[in-house]
Each structure stands twice: as C-alpha cells, then as structure tokens.
Amino acid sequence: MAEAEESPGDPGTASPRPLFAGLSDISISQDIPVEGEITIPMRSRIREFDSSTLNESVRNTIMRDLKAVGKKFMHVLYPRKSNTLLRDWDLWGPLILCVTLALMLQRDSADSEKDGGPQFAEVFVIVWFGAVTITLNSKLLGGNISFFQSLCVLGYCILPLTVAMLICRLVLLADPGPVNFMVRLFVVIVMFAWSIVASTAFLADSQPPNRRALAVYPVFLFYFVISWMILTFTPQ
C-alpha cells in the first residue's frame, strides 16, 4: 500500500502511515437500509397468469372465455359508462355477432344474388370494413383509444341489431302486410338507438370534447347501414 509523505514541519518524528487509513473511521448510519428485495410485481403477476392459463384444461379455457364474452354482452344490454370493454377487450364476441348476423341476413333462395339480397361475404365485409374505418377516423381525431379496443366496442354493440334481426325473422314468418312492416320498423329503430347509446357510452370519453360529434357521426352511419339491411330483408 502506498505510504503518505512525511510532515515537512517535523521530519524526524513523522512516521509513515497508510494513505487510506482514515477510511476506517467512516461509519454507516443505522437508519440507511443496506439490503432489500428487488421485485417487479407486474411481471410476476403476468408470469403467474401465464402459468395458470397454460396448466388449465381446454374446457376451463373455453368456459372462461365464454363467461368473459357474456359479461361484455350484459354491459352492452345495460349500457353505462364503464371501461370493461376497453380494458379487457377481445374480438371473439364481435366475430360471433358478425357471423350470426351475416347468416341471418343470408337469403334462403338460390337466386338471392340476382335479386340484390346481401350475401354472407358482403355483410361480413361491410361490418368489419365499417368498424375499421370508424376506428381510423377516431385515431385521426386524436382519440386515446387503441385500434383493437375500438373494434371490440363497435363489434359488441352490434348485439342489439342482431337481436333485432332475430325478431324480424320471427315476425316475417307471419303474413306480410302493413302491420308486419310497422312492427319490424319499430324493433329496428329501438335497437338502432340502443346500439348508438351503448357505443357512445364507451367511446365518448375517449375523444377530445370539441371533436366528439365528428367521432360519433360515422358510428351513426355505420349502425344505420346495418339497420337498413335488417329492415329491408325479405326471406324470398
């Protein structure tokens, strides 16, 4: 170890001492913690979730997903301001609703292509293309909602119109006439308004206050087109 230089004032009596000898007098305060744990709660939670889902059976996975879809259906049927659809988004519910609606709008006759009736692929494309267009419009207006969250909300809010389509199919089993049309018109208008209220309840707060009208207007057109296809549907 290097030695310190002798004192110039008293060269005869100075004795060499270690250069870092004074460091031994430094003490650490008892109030300062010198040990602890480094934990990352979020990663550990994600790791536990992954391990739990990997170890569960296929039946439990399907039932868990169906319960989640059912809860989101209830949020649409009883619309209120909530972040459930935005926080726990999925596309299973919108896919089920879109396929169901497209199947019910499919005409029974083999000549439905010639009489102008909507085909399965046409309905499927209209629904998803419309949802994507509204989502891009929302992002361009400065909305703080992600792409898939918007698709999830718009898809789940088709539920009232799907119910309207089911009711209209049942009404069409009776003899056609003015009363038949008025009943279908009333059902479609009510379910159309229901879809608008449900979607705006989830999406309104995600838009800037001065641009909410610009964001809601395409949603109105989107559900109006679907409602028009339902109202003008005839089985033959």
UniProtKB/Swiss-Prot annotation:
Lumenal side: 106-115, 168-184, 234-236
Ranges of the Cytoplasmic topological domain: 2-84, 137-146, 206-212
Cellular localization per UniProt: Golgi apparatus membrane
Residues annotated with Phosphoserine modification: 7
Pfam families membership: Yip1 (PF04893)
Top-level taxon in the UniProt lineage: Eukaryota
Single Gene Ontology BP annotation: endoplasmic reticulum to Golgi vesicle-mediated transport
Residues modified as N-acetylalanine: 2
Family: Belongs to the YIP1 family.
Name of the molecule in the record: Protein YIPF6
Organism of origin: Homo sapiens (Human)
Lineage: Eukaryota, Metazoa, Chordata, Craniata, Vertebrata
Gene name as annotated: YIPF6
